[in-house]
Amino acid sequence: MSRVMIEPASYDNIRKSVDRAFELFPADLSGKKVLIKPNVLRTAKPEEGITTHPALLEAVVEKVDSLGAGEIVVGDNPGMIDYGDNEKSFEKSGLMKAAKSCYRNMGTSSRKVGFNPDYMPTVSVSEDVLDADFFISLPKFKTHGLTVITGAIKNSYGILPGAIKAHLHKAAGSPQRFHELLVDVFRLRIPDLIIMDAVVGMEGNGPASTELRDIGQVLASDNAVAMDSVVSSMMGLDPGKLRFLQKAKQEGLGDYDPQSIKCIGEIKTFTDYHIPPLGGEANINNSAIQELIGNKTLLVPKVDADLCTSCENCIEHCPVGALDMGEDDIPVADSELCITCFCCQELCPEKAITLQ
């Protein structure tokens, strides 16, 4: 039976929760190379709730160091791929300072490994991920327009450097296939320990929504499927309705059935948690809608002219070239080309894009 720790926490006393996580999931880290991967979607301030909070990263780095790790590497591959974006993302989020000189740009060195040929025969994975003796994942408690939630499994998408993430979005072609692809990426290097920042969560059109909610908890587990099941339940969702959890169970990576999970601590269940449009219970249960989603997008990006600064970031990062500059220098999406990958929404620095 998988276990998930649910511990009350604030950013001021988060070290206590980290210590508790290592008590429940002990690890011999003496002399080992330890990779710590926060969720760094893009450049964002800590108070925006988009990235893993620096207080959690700092506490984990200090704990791992106290356990005698031989080498500590802190890194991620954010969605933005321009030169210097990795460093900028860590600096602005406060994670560079929290990493305590352990930061490394993981995107500069990678190796090709075999992958699911239905998408691509090989993919590049950051060498620091493949070479780590122990892999700690630090996801954020958030919703996601494409995958409904972004938790333990989705955080592993960041082991892929550069534009490979965008290429896989294009190769998937539909939300349902992307759910399945996520599990294939996750299997390339399964985290040994997951500690989730659920002190402040995100709802609505995540993973870069303006809607934040106080959760006041830190979650931990050595099984990502179990953790994402608990996160789904906390958001008021049936975890068995999420395709990526279904596939993960089929692949023997864990069980999302709440009866197979031992929760150490009290689960907070929110009956009014704001779920993205594609993630609503009505859509999940509606086979006709799901069939349409599998073949053609129901939602396309809409840009708020009052918020947009015409930076063209969304246009540059669209993997299928579905966005172009329209009238009044406001980007417009071609619904025939759009594959609903949500990259534009994720990477918009002004949060000016919604899927409608």
Can you describe what each PLM-predicted range is?
Residues 1-305, 309, 315-320, 324-330, ...:
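N-terminal and secondary-structure boundary signal
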Residues 306, 336-337:
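Short, contiguous acidic/charged loop-to-helix segments that flank catalytic cores in large enzymes
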Residues 338-355:
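Short Fe-S-cluster ligation motifs
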Residues 310-314, 341-344:
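Cysteine-cluster motifs in flexible loop/terminal segments that predominantly coordinate metals
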